[in-house]
Amino acid sequence: MKTSSFESASSSGGSGGGGGGGGGEGSGSFNLRNLSKLILPPLGVPAGGHAQSGHAGPNDRRVISPLDSRYRCWDTFMVVLVAYSAWVYPFEVAFMNASPKGGLEVADIVVDLFFAVDIVLTFFVAYIDSRTQLLVRDRRRIATRYLSTFFIMDVASTIPFQGLAYIVTGEVRESPAFSLLGILRLWRLRKVKQFFTRLEKDIRFNYFWIRCARLIAVTLFLVHCAGCLYYLIADRYPHREKTWIGAVIPDFQEASLWIRYTSSVYWSITTMTTVGYGDMHAQNTVEMIFNIFYMLFNLGLTAYLIGNMTNLVVEGTRRTMEFRNSIRAASNFVGRNHLPPRLKQQILAYMCLKFRAESLNQQQLMDQLPKSICKGICEYLFLPVVKDVYLFKGVSREVLLLMVTKMKPEYIPPKEDVIVQNEAPDDVYIVVSGEVEVIYSDGEAEERVVATLGTRGVFGEVSALSDRPQSFTLRTRTLCQLLRLRQAALKEAMQSKPEDSVVIIKNFLKHQIEMHDMKVEDLLGEDAAGEYDHGNIPCNLLTVAATGNSSFLEDLLKVGMDPDVGDSKGRTALHIAASKGYEDCVLVLLKQACNVNIKDAQGNTALWNAIAARHHKIFNILYHFARVSSPHHAAGDLLCLAARRGDLDTLRELLKHGLAVDSEDRDGATALRVALAEGHADVARLLVLNGASVDRAASHNEQQAAAAVSVDELRELMKTRELAHPVTIVVDSPSPAAAAVIREVGSSGDSRNGRRQSARSDGAHWPRVSIYRGHPFVRNRSSEAGKLINLPGTMEEFRIIIEEKLKVDARKTLIMNDEGAEIDSIDVIRDNDKLFIVTEEHMTAVASMDSVSGS
């Protein structure tokens, strides 16, 4: 704990306390005893700099700090002497005619000598300026202040006037004047008041008992003074038998001192407490007048005592009264709204628990303390529990401290739902004490307890780490103390140290595998969990990719896990995500530069898995990256693989995506050539019908083709296929998230392992269109084939391509869609559009056809 600021503050008040004592604060120690001695420096002023007022001189060392421990002892001793002096003065005046004898006389002289020493000592005691709250140590200012305030009264209360009279006259005189001058001794009672005020602020003592002691001392002193004064009236009255005490004790002056004093105090107490037994009462007018004023004074004193005691008692029961009022209000609320008994019990149980927990003042206290102290408290209270939780085993102390400082302790009553099934909680809970039931319900059957969490159990981590709703209801079985940690705080702590984040995630995955009493589907989902048994679930990206949980997958990749790790079958996370249609997971993996060309044990790439499972959007995204990394062989590799396997369905899907049917693979073979070599006649026919070049393939496969389908048959098939056969493209436009990933990855250049290469400058999807020569209304009568091209970025580039492909003057042509609408902007053309290039001849032909049909 940092105590430098406290030490400097206390040392400013205690250092330099030589002469009268410089211990205590000057030692630089800090404890509860020194806490009440702190002097706060002004705002913006260093504690050791200007916390003192005045200029230090050569005599500054003899100035005593009022906060010095030795001076405090002296001051306490003076309080004892003041109490003695205040008690003995009324007694001597009333019962000894102000002329003490024997031991009392000697004691009075000794006490007066001590008070004289205190007067001299006060000239060397620094003081705290009431305006600036600074310690003034300048002796000149100290002397000036004392002489102008308390000096005269202190001297007057110390002078032995009767002794001076004896020295001057040589006679011992008993005069009322000496008794009146003796009243000045009561001036010293201010020290007692200051003493009790200081004790009330000292946290080492109980405020209630200090306050009670103060009230009792005030009451007893007033009883003593009133009794002495009442006896003095009776003793000085000329007709002593007509006094309050003379009526009871006729010759009271001859009675012992103890009987007389006891009788006086007895009368004073019975009168003050308004009991008034009547055995001792006023017998003359003077006593009656005194009683009148005494009883009026008692009214005020009684009100003062009752008010103080009431405040002390009520303050102690205030919380209980507020609690009872809140319970009454809650009961009325339940009754008005006809809530069921179960809810009523939960409400009342929560309020009772809250009342009991408030006595600890945990959070309220923590909010008042500085961060360093809070950290120490949390470390002492929570760290021993948190470090043993399975989720945080092996995590560094630094990250653990970061988390425990953000944990909030809570008390939850029994039978309270902390997390409801299918809810996505925002917090992670750690069980410190009590038991929590894990309950499953399918909505129709009764609830079933599948597990019980005890001390150091944790729940809510599934939602925090995998962003999945909680598959179970977590309900307290007994009174539970829980530590609540916000998900945001957990993720912030994990991001602060990536290696600890890996440890937490591995602990989480390992624990989920070992939980035989829980369903694996809670983590993987029903489909993914079916692929693994409970004892053989890989704790890596493959498991998370199978869940489709892109957020958790991204967390794993950010902490450094390899995106290209494979299972026993060679499948990577991209293979699994692509085959299951998890587009978000695919995008996350692509952002982390995974290799799209990795093949599994069966020779399948993620691109093949996507098209085989008919996930066209994912195929479109992956094909973009495959074509970037292998621009000349991406299409050929896929078509040849489908042809080699004789997979007609997949081949049709590939052709629907507009892949060039004569594309070559890495070995220079086309799909038709592979189909002929493998003897897949149906595949060969499909390829020919979709525009494959027979002559190009036949030159390499004359012998193989004879076994399956003849080249002549294929050439004959070419004649029967539809001329200008258009390709029907089913590629959807990329989603905004996919387009963002394409732009991000495409603009980042080379990545790790050299797998990612630059894409198009605009980073967008490659739209392709079919262009035909002729008017769309008469296109079916044309015998000229169309062309499938990549759409350029501008209309000027588009017209240049038209001139090259269709051999027409593009400046004198119109571009129309299949509905006959003219297109004059490249921005309105979409992927898979069919465009028609219309010349003047085509327009004339259409006009002539309209005139003939009209006639």
UniProtKB/Swiss-Prot annotation:
Repeat region (ANK), residues: 536-565, 569-598, 602-631, 634-663, 667-696
Domain spans labelled KHA: 768-855
Classification via Pfam families: Ank_2, cNMP_binding, Ion_trans, KHA
Keyword tRNA processing: no
Extracellular side: 97-105, 171-179, 236-262, 283-285
Keyword Hydrolase attributed: no
Intramembrane segments: 263-282
Cytoplasmic topological domain: 1-75, 127-149, 201-214, 307-855
Cysteine pairings via disulfide bonds: none
Transmembrane segments: 76-96, 106-126, 150-170, 180-200, 215-235, 286-306
Compartment(s): Membrane
GO biological-process terms attached to the record: regulation of membrane potential; response to abscisic acid
Keywords on record: ANK repeat, Ion channel, Ion transport, Membrane, Potassium, Potassium channel, Potassium transport, Repeat, Transmembrane, Transmembrane helix, Transport, Voltage-gated channel
Main location as per UniProt: membrane
Amino acids binding a nucleoside 3',5'-cyclic phosphate: 391-511
GO molecular function: identical protein binding; voltage-gated potassium channel activity
GO CC, one annotated term: monoatomic ion channel complex
InterPro entries in alphabetical order: Ankyrin_rpt (IPR002110), Ankyrin_rpt-contain_sf (IPR036770), cNMP-bd_dom (IPR000595), cNMP-bd_dom_sf (IPR018490), Ion_trans_dom (IPR005821), K_chnl_volt-dep_EAG/ELK/ERG (IPR003938), KAT/AKT (IPR045319), KHA_dom (IPR021789)
Family classification: Belongs to the potassium channel family. Plant (TC 1.A.1.4) subfamily.
Comment, domains: The segment S4 is probably the voltage-sensor and is characterized by a series of positively charged amino acids. The pore-forming region H5 is enclosed by the transmembrane segments S5 and S6 in the Shaker-type (1P/6TM) and contains the GYGD signature motif which seems to be involved in potassium selectivity.
Oligomer and partners: The potassium channel is probably a homo- or heterotetrameric complex of pore-forming subunits.
Function summary: Probable inward-rectifying potassium channel. Assuming opened or closed conformations in response to the voltage difference across the membrane, the channel is activated by hyperpolarization.
Full protein name: Potassium channel AKT2
Organism of provenance: Oryza sativa subsp. japonica
